[in-house]
UniProtKB/Swiss-Prot annotation:
It catalyses: L-seryl-[protein] + ATP = O-phospho-L-seryl-[protein] + ADP + H(+); L-threonyl-[protein] + ATP = O-phospho-L-threonyl-[protein] + ADP + H(+). Gene3D superfamilies: Phosphorylase Kinase, domain 1, Transferase(Phosphotransferase) domain 1. It is found in: Cytoplasm; Nucleus. It comes from Exserohilum turcicum. This is Mitogen-activated protein kinase HOG1.
Length: 329
C-alpha cells in the first residue's frame, strides 16, 4: 500500500515483462487529491533518469481510478535493512545511486520531500531507483506543516514549517546512509518534540543563526529555553564505519541547510570514489514546469488536465514507436 494508492505486480502481455501497477483510488474525490495525482503524473513524465522509477503506461478505468504502470523492482531498501546488515560495498553503491538520482532531481528544480528507505527500490542487480513523487514540490517553496516521514525529516522542516529547499533531501539521504551503516534508524523520534531532542543529543543545539530563521513563535518558545548541547563526534557513534564514510555523513547531517553538502559535492567525496564518474552523472535537460502548483482549481478542471496529460503521454509514446529508425543515410 502506497501513501495514497495500492501497488501490485503484474505482467505486461505485450512485452512479457513484469511491471508494478499503482492504483490511485478515487483520484478526483477532492481538489487536493486531484492536484496531487496530477503532480505525480507530470513529474513521472518529466523525470527520466536511471535512478528514478520510470513510467511505462498510464490509464483511467471506467470508474475513474487511475493506474500508473512502472518498471518492477524486486524489493526496497526498508525490506533489505530489516532483513540483514548491508556489506560495505552495497552501502557505498546504494548511497552513490541515491545521490546520483538526487543530483538529477534537484537540477530539474524539484525537491522530493519524502525520501525514506521504503521509497527507494532495488532489484537483484542492486540497481536502485527513487520512487513516490506524490509529495514532491518546487524548490524554495513557502510551505505549511510536516510532510516527510518523521525519522528522515530535516530539522528545518520541524523548526520553520516555512522555507526549505533541496537540502531537506540531503538530510534524509544522510539519515538513510546512517541507517545502512548501523542497521537501525538514526533518529527514531516518537513525536516531533522527541525527534528534535534525539537530533540535538547527537548533533548539538542548533546555531543561533539557524534559530533566528524560525518563523513559528510556538517553535521559538520551544527551542530557545532548551539546554545547550555540544555536537558529538559521529566517529564515536559509528565506530565500525570507515573514516571517509563518517566524514561524508558529517557533511550531510548539518543543522544549517546552507552548510549542508549538495548532491554533486557528495558524489565527488572520496568515500564514493569507486563509483564517481562526473561524465555519467547527468542533470535534467530542463527545469520542471511548476506553473500549475499554486493553482486552486475545481476537481473538474484537474480532471480535464489529467486526461490531457494521459492523452499526451500516449500520443508521444505512439509517435516514438512509429518513428522510423535511423539508417545512417
Amino acid at each position: 500500500m502506497g501513501a495514497f494508492g495500492l501497488v501490485c505486480s503484474a505482467k505486461d502481455q505485450l512485452t512479457n515483462q513484469a511491471v508494478a501497477v499503482k492504483k490511485i483510488m478515487k483520484p478526483f474525490s477532492t481538489p487536493v487529491l486531484s492536484k496531487r495525482t496530477y503532480r505525480e503524473l507530470k513529474l513521472l513524465k518529466h523525470l527520466r533518469h536511471e535512478n528514478i522509477i520510470s513510467l511505462s503506461d498510464i490509464f483511467i478505468s471506467p470508474l475513474e481510478d487511475i493506474y500508473f504502470v512502472t518498471e518492477l523492482l524486486g524489493t526496497d531498501l526498508h525490506r533489505l535493512l530489516t532483513s540483514r546488515p548491508l556489506e560495505k560495498q552495497f552501502i557505498q553503491y546504494f548511497l552513490y545511486q541515491i545521490l546520483r538520482g538526487l543530483k538529477y532531481i534537484h537540477s530539474a528544480g524539484v525537491v522530493h520531500r519524502d525520501l525514506k528507505p521504503s521509497n527507494i527500490l532495488v532489484n537483484e542487480n542492486c540497481d536502485l531507483k527513487i520512487c513516490d513523487f506524490g509529495l514532491a514540490r518546487i524548490q524554495d517553496p513557502q510551505v505549511t506543516g510536516y510532510v516527510s516521514t518523521r525519522y528522515y525529516r530535516a530539522p528545518e522542516i520541524m523548526l520553520t514549517w516555512q522555507k526549505y529547499d533541496v537540502e531537506v533531501d540531503i538530510w534524509s539521504a544522510g539519515c538513510i546512509f546512517a541507517e545502512m551503516l548501523e542497521g537501525k534508524p538514526l533518529f527514531p523520534g516518537k513525536d516531533h518534540v522527541n525527534q528534535f531532542s534525539i537530533i540535538t543529543e547527537l548533533l548539538g543545539t542548533p546555531p543561533d543563526d539557524v534559530i533566528q530563521t524560525i518563523c513559528s513563535e510556538n517553535t521559538l518558545r520551544f527551542v530557545q529555553p532548551l539546554p545547550k548541547r555540544e555536537r558529538q563526534p559521529l566517529a564515536n557513534k559509528f565506530k565500525n564505519a570507515e573514516p571517509e564514510a563518517v566524514d561524508l555523513l558529517e557533511n550531510m547531517l548539518v543543522f544549517d541547510p546552507r552548510k549542508r553538502v549538495r548532491a554533486e559535492q557528495a558524489l565527488a567525496h572520496p568515500y564514493l570514489a569507486p563509483y564517481h564518474d562526473p561524465t555519467d552523472e547527468p542533470i535534467a535537460e530542463e527545469k520542471f514546469d511548476w506553473s500549475f502548483n499554486d493553482a486552486d482549481l475545481p476537481v473538474d478542471t484537474w480532471k480535464i488536465m489529467m486526461y490531457s496529460e494521459i492523452l499526451d503521454y500516449h500520443n508521444v509514446d505512439a509517435a516514438a514507436q512509429d518513428a522510423p529508425e535511423s539508417n545512417g543515410s
